[in-house]
Amino acid sequence: MDRIQFGTLSIPSCPVDEYMNKFFDSEESLDDVESKNLGSFSEGLKELEDGNLDLLAIPAQILHGKQLEMYNSGCEVIGARTPRTPNMILVSENKLQYQPKSAIILSDSKLIRSQLRRARRGIRVLSSKAFIEINKITEKFEDELEKYSWMERLRLNGEIDGFVIPRVIYSQIEINGRRHTLLPDPHNLGDNHFLPKPYSDLVVIIGRKNFPNSIGKLLTETEGDTIWKIQDYFLGAMKEDNIDEIGFLVRHRKLSTLMLQAEKDRDLLMEQAFHDYEGEVTTSEVLVEIKIERISNDGKKTISLHRVIPYSEYQVAIVSAEKDWRKILQNAFDVDPKFIND
């Protein structure tokens, strides 16, 4: 087999080059791979078109809204890699529930701001832009690393009580404060939870059409493929501005893990879903869990959908799940047209 020419495109919140180089150094990787970093999506497509690259790995969020450009270049997504660090981190001396009244927390994600307001009433949750305008200060940032370093200085100076940062960026800058991971699973049923942003830390791999599947499977992961296909099916037609209003979690689960969680939460519906009338387990395959939610700006209202599907059925089941999700949203807006803006 000829040496594979592999390109990567990275952003601070999804350093694809680091992820892929770590994989290439592992025993699971192919031996003959030559990797190089690229500066833009268009450059990567051009390199693929010209035959200078065989494959291109990019953050999935960059591909959103650009799939027509990809198809016109004679390329397609051949697979994806499972997110390693999709959850966000709250940097603060206090856990969220112990924040003082009127504490100031910064986050540049509309979703995260709504989730924080839902979880803790009485705190001020602002974007960096709003904080700058309110305090009439002048700040410009070259990149995300510089922006989060500025937030850390504000926290150390006592001007804010905390800020929310992607886990991977937290590891790249010097932060000495306590950290609290915003997890998607509540400790107890009904407790606070924080679904990740769509495409969070998800890497997709693009190749020319008819690229050998046998090679593609060696570089992609089944769970990553599932996450990409489901999120793309639900969100592919949405405007980019609306993506940040949605929390979306897709993952593979073992039945035993789900049953333990259902027993802990006394969730009889989940316990009975995969057992027959005699109490026997009806499936032994991997399950696909889908959680999606949309929250009003003030955090007081949440619309959500939760499905657990056998892996062999998920590509059919997501068709009805996506229709149900659209109906739920439409019904909510019919009842209250200002649902999201409250």
Where do the model's predicted regions map?
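Short beta-strand-centered segments that line the small-molecule binding cleft or hinge
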Residues: G44-N87
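Long, charged, alpha-helical interaction scaffolds
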Residues: A80-T82, K101-L106, L116-R117, V125
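Small-molecule-sensing regulatory modules
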Residues: M1-K46, R113-S114, R118-D342
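Flexible hinge/capping segments at coil-to-helix
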Residues: I89-I105, A119
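Small-molecule pocket liners
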Residues: C75, R84-E93, H193, Y199-I205
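Local beta-strand N-terminus motif with an aromatic residue
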Residues: N52-L53, S102, I160
